């Protein structure tokens, strides 16, 4: 359980990254979504005790982030977006070193590392230099660290940013095997829908939406996405589920041959809020 109370972060240049976040994140998989600069990473860094808040506080399983830093780090694994394995080390060495650093004996770390890498499909590569691995495999090594350490809480910051679709699915499969509470930040709506039980939408350091995927979609029941099909195969996706206007000069050049009506998705919920915030 993560609880935050009026959490604020203002950087020295005056940028307000978090503007009074008060939320409770219960024991399950939670996705924090939002555009770049919404405050997702700042939130993750503060709650994982890597960054001090300007004001406010947070608790992780009852532990105070300002007073119980060491205890929180012992029960949490945080994987930042920029994390990358040390190229000369093998995945086996990476995971074993990580576990020993958290207090596990060398013999136990060796056994657990090998078994966990096998479990996540890295048996063939566990003794190869990490700089020979694909982007997806490198990210899986870090998920493997979290799985092997068996912490109470795992924080994943943008776990699949920059990965190709195949690598992204590989990482998703690995994440689904994590035990304990998992909190991930992402701007991929498909990722949030596939991995999380609950979604929290951040925008400009504030919480705009908070609930299960099913609950969020039900709030927009009756709204649909409409795509207009033109004669030259040019499709127009209608934002905010409605057509605001059609320029008559454009209409002269195109013939509407048909349309497709689709059910609203989490991606659409995100886009709707984006329009509302910017207007």
Model regions: which residues?
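Conserved ABC ATPase signature
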Residues: 88, 129-136
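Conserved structural motif at the start of ABC-family nucleotide-binding domains
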Residues: 2, 17-18, 73
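Catalytic Walker B motif of ABC-type/P-loop ATPase nucleotide-binding domains
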Residues: 154-158
